[in-house]
From Swiss-Prot:
InterPro entries: EIF3B, eIF3B_RRM, Nucleotide-bd_a/b_plait_sf, RBD_domain_sf, RRM_dom, TIF_beta_prop-like, WD40/YVTN_repeat-like_dom_sf. It comes from Drosophila sechellia. Residues 15-25 have a biased composition (Acidic residues). Component of the eukaryotic translation initiation factor 3 (eIF-3) complex. The eIF-3 complex interacts with pix. Interacts with mxt. This is Eukaryotic translation initiation factor 3 subunit B. The lineage of its organism: Eukaryota, Metazoa, Ecdysozoa, Arthropoda, Hexapoda. Residues 1-37 are annotated as: Disordered. Its main location: cytoplasm.
Length: 690
């Protein structure tokens, strides 16, 4: 027993010896910490509660009527109806005097602070009647105005920053297009290279390491490129892609530019939902913010073609905001019970939306003119399961793809709905004709894809079974029903990509990586059928001269890169790039030439052919000369390296002879070599003869 205790004691002493004295984590005397809390814990401090938390959603309404208790309920109903247009009201307090008479002001608490701010903007100085005009303020404004210093200090003068030319990329006399290539070099670290597509080989303009965390995106006119980072996003531009503006929105997942590049919308998650912020690109100022319950169709904003309006869909309504104030159009939403989707015309301030079937009332597609809110065309539809709105790029036509059913099956509680006997209609709206006539095309097969010709009057569809589908081309003309002009049968394709200039189309199977180039003006012949295994993207350049197919590392990890083709499908460049992420052509702004001037140039184009061909020959000759000079320089460099190594090899001969037993192995004759032939059995075959 004593022996056991002594063993335990020795074991405890050994364990105690393993634990040394704890280190001292205190700062040494005279230590000065140069790192502020904001730099060290900026992301956490941004979420700490402020003193105003809890009252920032409260508004104070002054100059309301002073009424007796008998009339108080009526006053409450009037004011609540007015203020509830801007959000959900949680609580209302009407202070009263000893006699029960209101004191002429009230406190209202909204569910969200943004709703309170909206109510202040819209209802401050609102005239209730000839004797009462509201004075509406945020509750937090009282403390803000109390802390205003009595002595005014002039603002500091900021130095003027000279900005580079943002449109230098269109000043190239030969109008070569630019593109960017992104490749991931490390987790959350993407390298981006910018290139100019010159002949005979593209020219590298700029390469940026660690340029973005995920991917990049061009603005609609090609002026800016946006990068994504943990604190927010940044836009770059100019000749060397300098930083133009940054927008602090942590965790931004997606951005969207307005068509004229005046505004930027950022979408990023928050602990309470999805935060959406609209920014002014030139000033970097936040114009408006929203909180949504997640990334859904309801949270997406859609812009008018001229940046004058931005709209989003709400529950049974459309919210249209005017720029630059971002107030609701006419200070109220457009109530549309049963709305399921909407889309702006790409060239006019016209909104198309569709409404689902309700209580034996048919579904409806409506065209509404903004800002007048005037309905210019309606189309009733029956037995509708879903609709998709497809505008032609020129705004000449609108196609509504209608998924229709023959029979509807519901369960007892109407929770599960099944559509049986599906077929499809294409409702074509002729936007440029009087009273906007509508034509209909019915297809009894499954529709896999739809695409308008950007410039022209044709559209194409993929229909049938997935593995053996058909591609049909229709032509739309004035006064006649859309006609089928060509059907290509048994085509294994999943997507359709029209050239931005029309005429040529790529039928792609992005599952197998096969492509077919079709000329729609030459009896729809297939000019080429290349393949690019595992290709996941197709990009036309803005002029319609080149097509790029890419295999992204987002899809696979091996053999990533991109191929470049002519518009007829001839391969001109293959690039294998490790961890390739994306390829994007730089968009071009619209031409400044009038339609008459463009027609004149096209008419006299033959006059310019000789000059263009001569310039191309000179460029190719110059390029060939430069290539020969480059090869000659490489050969000279190699021969210099080779001669240097031969000299080193000769200097080491004595050392080699000594190490090899005084045998000069550099000049061995074949007679001194013994050759031995060895045979061994590889396999044995037995053949039976009858």
């Amino acid at each position: 027993m004593a022996k056991k205790k002594s063993e335990e004691q020795s074991s405890a002493d050994a364990n105690d010896s393993d634990y040394q004295e704890e280190p001292n984590f205190e700062d040494p005397p005279g230590f000065v910490d140069n790192i502020s809390d904001e730099d060290l814990l900026g992301d956490m401090l941004a979420q700490r509660p402020s003193e105003a938390d809890g009252v920032e959603s409260v508004v104070v309404v002054d100059n309301i009527p002073k009424v007796e208790p008998v009339r108080l309920e009526k006053l409450k109903s009037v004011i609540n109806k007015l203020f509830s247009n801007y959000g959900d009201i949680v609580n209302v307090v009407y202070p009263v005097d000893e006699e029960g008479k209101t004191k002429g002001y009230a406190f209202m608490e909204y569910k969200q602070a943004s709703q309170a701010e909206e109510a202040v903007k819209k209802l401050n100085n609102h005239r209730l009647d000839k004797n009462h005009t509201f004075a509406v303020n945020l509750f937090t404004d009282f403390q803000k105005y109390e802390n205003i210093p009595e002595k005014w200090e002039p603002p500091t003068v900021q130095t003027f920053k000279v900005q580079s030319d943002l449109y230098n990329f269109i000043n190239d006399p030969d109008t070569y297009d630019q593109y960017c290539v992104a490749a991931e070099t490390a987790p959350n670290c993407v390298q981006v290279g910018f290139w100019q597509n010159v002949l005979p080989e593209p020219f590298e303009l700029e390469t940026r390491e660690r340029f973005t965390d995920t991917f990049v995106k061009w603005s609609p006119l090609g002026t800016y490129v946006v990068t994504f980072h943990k604190p927010g996003v940044a836009i770059w531009g100019g000749s060397s892609f300098q930083k133009i503006q940054k927008f602090p929105h942590p965790g931004t997942q997606f951005v969207e530019f307005s068509p004229c590049e005046n505004y930027l919308v950022t979408y990023g998650p928050t602990p309470t939902g999805q935060k959406i912020i609209i920014w002014d690109i030139r000033t970097g100022a936040e114009k408006r913010s929203f909180v949504a319950d997640g990334m859904s169709v309801l949270s997406m904003f859609r812009w008018s073609h001229d940046d004058k309006f931005v709209a989003r869909m709400g529950e049974n309504s459309i919210h249209i905001y005017e720029t630059p104030s971002f107030y609701l159009l006419d200070l109220k939403s457009i109530k549309i019970p049963g709305i399921r989707g909407f889309s702006w015309s790409p060239t006019d301030n016209v909104i198309a939306y569709w409404v689902e079937e309700q209580n034996q009332i048919p579904a409806r597609v409506t065209l509404m003119e903004i800002p007048k809110k005037r309905e210019i065309r309606n189309k009733n539809l029956f037995h509708v399961a879903d609709c998709k709105l497809h505008w032609q790029k020129s705004g000449d036509y609108l196609c509504v793809k209608v998924d229709r059913y023959s029979k509807l099956k519901k369960d007892k509680k109407d929770l599960d709905v099944k559509f049986l006997g599906m077929f499809y209609n294409f409702e074509i709206f002729h936007m440029r004709e009087k009273e906007i006539p509508v034509d209909s095309v019915e297809i009894r097969e499954l529709i896999l894809a739809f695409a308008w010709e950007p410039i022209g009057n044709k559209f194409s569809i993929i229909h049938g079974e997935t593995n053996s589908s058909n591609v049909s081309f229709y032509e739309v003309n004035k006064g006649v029903k859309p006609s089928l002009v060509k059907r290509l049968e048994k085509k294994s394709c999943t997507h359709l990509f029209w050239s931005p200039r029309g005429q040529f189309i790529v039928m792609a199977n992005l599952t197998m990586g096969t492509f077919e180039f079709v000329d729609s003006t030459n009896d729809y012949i297939i000019t080429s059928s290349p393949d690019h295994f595992r290709a996941s993207e197709v990009e036309w350049d803005p002029t319609g001269r080149y097509v790029v197919t890419g295999v992204s590392s987002w899809k696979v990890k091996e053999d990533t890169g991109f191929n470049m083709y002519t518009f007829q499908g001839r391969i001109i460049k293959r690039t294998i790039l490790k961890n390739f992420v994306q390829f994007l052509w730089r968009p071009r702004p619209p031409t400044l030439l009038s339609e008459e001037k463009q027609k004149e140039i096209k008419k006299n184009l033959k006059k310019y052919y000789a000059a263009f061909e001569q310039k191309d020959r000179l460029r190719l000759t110059r390029a060939s000369k430069e290539l020969l000079e480059k090869r000659s320089q490489l050969r000279e460099t190699f021969m210099e390296y080779r001669n240097k190594r031969i000299a080193e090899w000769a200097d080491q001969k004595s050392r080699r002879i000594m190490l090899r037993g005084h045998v000069d192995t550099d000049n061995l004759e074949t007679d001194e070599v013994d050759e031995e032939i060895v045979e061994f059995l590889v396999k044995e075959e037995v053949t039976l003869l009858e």
